[in-house]
Amino acid sequence: MKDKIIGKGTWLDKVANSLIIREKKLGRSLDLIKVESGLGASGIPHIGSTGDAVRAYGIGLALNNLGFKSELITYSDDMDGLRKIPTGFPLWLDDYIAKPVSTIPDPFGNCHKSYGEHMSSLLLESLDKVGIKFNYRSASDVYKSGILAREIDCILSNNELLGKKIFNLVSQDKYIDVLPYFPVCNNCGRLYVARAEKYLSNERKVLYSCSGSKIGTKKISGCGHKGESDISKGEGKLAWKVEFAARWKALDIRFEAYGKDIMDSVRVNDWVSTSLLNFPHPLHVKYEMFLDKRGKKISKSAGNVLTPQMWLKYGTPASILLLLFKRISGTRHIGLDDIPTLMDEYDYYEDIYFDKIKENNNSKKIKLKGIYEYVNKLNPPYNTLKHIPYRILVQQASFFTGEGRSDNIFLRLKKYGLVEEKTDDLINKIS
């Protein structure tokens, strides 16, 4: 018996269908299904950061295709403290280690209000360029507005139970003795260095002492201040082990993918969400991390970042979307030299879609056509144009510079019989 084709036959459709089945069993409203992507704000966003948001958006598209409304929430973790200076950043940032990135000056001038806003803007800019629609939320605004106050209160009021459960789940004993909350010391302005010692539930305040902490390999001294942190005014933040759960419930999130590097945090957050906050945790998909060509993890702070901006300098938005939509499983080694292959692969998918290339395997054909439609955000073009191998375009582009460059390249391609007319698509690829 052949497997039933769901939606457009892609992994996006399978996940969306599983999500709908799960939500119906839970009896939750399906009027608007929110999917989420967390955005790190501590360093330059890389292609993997973009991937998390793009895939979540893809699930939203698949939900739309199945007849349901969806919304992508992009959540910037700009309350996180700066743990180290990313490669190539100004050394004066050393004075701001452990301070929330939303309170650190913009290291690249005055174009943004803070370090965190600058880093977040780079990722949001890339999402705009590839045509992703989203609702942006920043952690600093969410905490300051008190949106998470009810969830924080529930979590801190159950800290003894929570500390034991975290130890049972991931063998971490830290939160048996310490509250899973990082106050911002109101004297030195740092996170992580102030030890949360007691929660006053009636006042919704955390008592702390700024005693210092080890961040990575660096010991950060505390200033000795003793104070209190109001959980409803953004004077601190939850630890990652419990923070996801709080925002899932507060923002009504139904889907969020995650990388295997934070698997332990997700396990704990799932329990917190379901068992403490009485909000069945979102459906998840686990993805492997992107690696560079040497097999090293692409890192915001290690200096081997492949950014979406770098990619879009040479490739089209469609090439990024194809990279991220065609599959989710397996580790991939990526670099700029993959762009020509993906550009030509997109043309192949387009030829399959318009039946210029025959594919005898029907399920494969449906899947390839489905991926093409999702790359085009369910609004594919009405017809296809003649394709030019991308490496030939790159070669021709290297021959011509200056004024009239596009015209000269077009004339050369026309001479070779590769094009008949100058189109917007051709000009975009040349430029």
Which stretches of residues belong to each language-model region?
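A glycine-rich helix N-cap at a beta->alpha junction
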Residues: 92-130
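Catalytic adenosine-cofactor/nucleotide-binding cores of aminoacyl-tRNA synthetases and other
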Residues: 261, 266, 287-431
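Residue-level signal for inorganic ion chemistry
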Residues: 46, 155, 316
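Anion (oxyanion) recognition and catalysis
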Residues: 64, 128, 156
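Flexible loop/turn segments at secondary-structure boundaries
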Residues: 41-44, 79-83, 144-145, 290-297, ...
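N-terminal catalytic cores of NTP/NDP-binding nucleotidyl/phosphoryl-transfer enzymes
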Residues: 1-88, 243-265
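Charged, often glycine-rich, active-site loop that binds/positions anionic groups
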Residues: 80-96, 151-152, 156, 297, ...
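Active-site cores that bind ATP or allylic diphosphates and position pyrophosphate for catalysis
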Residues: 132-302, 308
